[in-house]
């Protein structure tokens, strides 16, 4: 993809990767900004944070002992870093702080680059998701990035995404379809496919409490860390289908009424027919192959849910994760999401009702 461009979705309410959803327009997603050194988003990924921490450790080791010990940075969990930050000796905490500060500066530079895109020029708020967000170090990095941006004249608010990363990519699926598809039901099946994990779950609406679906939550979650097993594509699809069939039984056992809908969040640029144009390189096997269509495979495996034909819709995973924040984005017109994970997922939205006004 050329510099400063992003995927432009198709304008069809029930198409995969659609630009027009019931409450928002998806203006752009999966922007792949490049420099001579590589993708801009790689400067604000989980690997980037680990590389920054490694660099600080190497510098300190030249002067004496590493306060973090001998454990490789990639093996130090977010919980361990959080504990070091709060309870570690001053030098260990200072090293973690240094990594957070440098990462925040890099993240701010990445966001400034995104703000130069025409689709992003009016953004008022950015929600930040992904695995790093689910930690105190991630929250501090987001907060520090927000301060850096405002200090440099950018009136953009940054907020950590509300839901846990394992849940946000599932909950967002309830906003992929018009409300009439969900009417008379209390839950859906949702799938979140990532470079390391595949998640499937039952998302319960709780719409009697909150009509805007802000009380929606994950009733049941199945998670498989496929990166540990390195499966073939067909094995991964079959495992996912097993998850979904088990979840249908679980919903019935728990007295839930599933809507005839499966929502999918998947990395990459999603064509209107449900195939993946590009961006699936971290998935198990070749998901961009001609003739492979995940929504079609799931429809064949679950042709009906209850008494109705199954509707399956797939969109980019960052888009779906961002949609989980929709109930809390009603006071702004233009907003965006960035997900810090294997790479940097991204999407920009416009609230349709506010834009019309």
Region spans (language model):
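Gly/Thr-rich phosphate-binding beta-strand-loop-beta motif of the actin/hexokinase/Hsp70
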Residues: 2, 7-69, 73, 173-174, ...
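Short loop/turn segments at strand-loop or loop-helix junctions that form parts
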Residues: 48-62, 76-89, 128-131, 194, ...
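Alpha-helix termini
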Residues: 64, 114-122, 149-153, 178-183, ...
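Adenine-nucleotide phosphate-binding core of ATP-dependent small-molecule kinases
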Residues: 70-122, 160-166, 223-258
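Glycine-rich phosphate-binding loops at beta-strand->alpha-helix junctions
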Residues: 100, 106, 118-148, 268-270
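Short coil/turn connectors at secondary-structure junctions
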Residues: 123, 184-187, 258, 308-310, ...
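Glycine-rich phosphate-binding loop and adjoining helix at the ATP-binding site
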Residues: 134-164, 224-238, 261, 270-335, ...
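Conserved small-residue-rich
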Residues: 174-178, 185-262, 267, 295
């Amino acid at each position: 993809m050329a510099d400063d461009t992003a995927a432009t979705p198709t304008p069809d309410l029930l198409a995969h990767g659609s630009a027009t959803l019931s409450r928002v327009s998806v203006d752009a997603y999966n922007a792949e900004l490049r420099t001579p050194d590589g993708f801009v988003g790689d400067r604000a990924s989980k690997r980037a944070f680990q590389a920054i921490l490694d660099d600080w450790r190497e510098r300190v080791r030249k002067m004496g002992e590493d306060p973090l010990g001998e454990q490789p940075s990639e093996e130090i969990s977010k919980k361990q870093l959080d504990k070091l930050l709060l309870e570690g000796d001053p030098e260990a905490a200072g090293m973690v702080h240094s990594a957070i500060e440098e990462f925040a500066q890099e993240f701010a530079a990445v966001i400034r680059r995104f703000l130069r895109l025409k689709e992003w020029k009016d953004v008022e708020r950015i929600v930040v998701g992904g695995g790093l967000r689910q930690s105190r170090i991630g929250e501090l990095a987001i907060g520090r990035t927000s301060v850096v941006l405002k200090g440099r004249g950018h009136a953009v608010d940054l907020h950590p995404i509300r839901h846990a990363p394992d849940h946000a990519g599932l909950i967002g699926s309830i906003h992929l379809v018009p409300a009439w598809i969900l009417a008379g039901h209390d839950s859906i099946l949702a799938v979140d496919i990532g470079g390391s994990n595949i998640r499937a779950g039952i998302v319960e609406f709780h719409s009697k409490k909150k009509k805007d679906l802000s009380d929606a939550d994950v009733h049941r979650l199945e998670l498989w860390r496929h990166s540990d097993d390195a499966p073939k594509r067909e094995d991964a699809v079959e495992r996912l289908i097993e998850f979904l069939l088990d979840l249908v039984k679980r919903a019935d056992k728990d007295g839930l009424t599933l809507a005839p809908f499966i929502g999918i969040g998947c990395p990459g640029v999603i064509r209107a027919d449900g195939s993946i144009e590009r961006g699936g390189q971290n998935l198990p096997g070749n998901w961009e192959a001609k003739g492979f269509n995940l929504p079609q495979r799931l429809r064949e495996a679950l042709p009906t849910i209850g008494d109705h034909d199954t509707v399956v819709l797939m969109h980019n995973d960052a888009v779906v994760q961002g949609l989980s924040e929709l109930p809390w984005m009603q006071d702004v017109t233009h907003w965006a999401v960035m997900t810090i994970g294997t790479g940097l997922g991204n999407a920009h939205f416009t609230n349709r009702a506010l834009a019309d006004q």
